[in-house]
């Protein structure tokens, strides 16, 4: 038997090879959908279309909120142009511990541990910390990932055992 510990190696951060974005025609985008604006993944909060002018296509004006920073971004593009739409994934993790501002999380399905996410430096982070310290049930945090970024964007207490 060799001393190689191949089963100790974990490659959880590897990219599946799937694209982080996909193209979608500007005129097909809708409010509450996601879109990339200035290289950031955003949720569309407002859209308006201007009529076709004598110099070309109808224009679509979008107002969107960055899903990670909550900053408001705007873009105007011809309705026939393609825009990048980020692939946004949401997962729930069980909060096991909060250590030095980082969350120790466990996937409730696979039991895999995740220790690389910072507790948000906002009111949301304080709410999660308070719920965890009250110990009234399991705290589940919602982790959103897009374009290689991840952040905790929500939480709830699960009282079922």
Swiss-Prot record:
Pfam families: eIF-5a, IF5A-like_N. This is Eukaryotic translation initiation factor 5A-2. GO terms for cellular component: cytoplasm. Its main location: cytoplasm. It is found in: Cytoplasm. The modification Hypusine is found at residue 54. It comes from the Eukaryota. Lys-54 undergoes hypusination, a unique post-translational modification that consists in the addition of a butylamino group from spermidine to lysine side chain and leads to the formation of a hypusine residue. eIF-5As are the only known proteins to undergo this modification, which is essential for their function. GO terms for molecular function: ribosome binding; RNA binding; translation elongation factor activity. It comes from Caenorhabditis elegans. Keywords: Cytoplasm, Elongation factor, Hypusine, Protein biosynthesis, RNA-binding. One of its GO terms (biological process) is positive regulation of translational termination. Signal peptide: none annotated. The keyword Plastid does not apply. Belongs to the eIF-5A family. The gene is iff-2. The keyword Protein biosynthesis applies. Expressed in the somatic tissues. Translation factor that promotes translation elongation and termination, particularly upon ribosome stalling at specific amino acid sequence contexts. Binds between the exit (E) and peptidyl (P) site of the ribosome and promotes rescue of stalled ribosome: specifically required for efficient translation of polyproline-containing peptides as well as other motifs that stall the ribosome. Acts as a ribosome quality control (RQC) cofactor by joining the RQC complex to facilitate peptidyl transfer during CAT tailing step.
